[in-house]
Structure formats: C-alpha cells, structure tokens
Amino acid sequence: DIFCGETCAFIPCITHVPGTCSCKSKVCYFN
C-alpha cells in the first residue's frame, strides 16, 4: 500500500496505486 500524501480525519489516505489524493468532507478522494 502507498500513502498518497494526505491524512483525512486523522487517518492516512492509503491507496494500492501511486498517485495523490484530496481530503473532502473527511473522505479521501483519489486522482
């Protein structure tokens, strides 16, 4: 797993593919 670079609601955003994410309304959205 890869930490995408943002923490949302104190939880690191984790994805299975490289990339970045944004935190909106305490939910991680992945590009």
Curated annotation (Swiss-Prot):
The presence of a 'disulfide through disulfide knot' structurally defines this protein as a knottin. Disulfide bonds join 4-21, 8-23, 13-28. Probably participates in a plant defense mechanism. There is a cross-link at residues 1-31 (Cyclopeptide (Asp-Asn)). GO terms for biological process: defense response. SUPFAM superfamilies: Cyclotides. Belongs to the cyclotide family. Bracelet subfamily. InterPro entries: Cyclotide, Cyclotide_sf. This is Cycloviolacin-O25. This is a cyclic peptide. It comes from Viola odorata. Keywords: Disulfide bond, Knottin, Plant defense. Expressed in roots and runners but not in leaves, petals and petioles (at protein level).
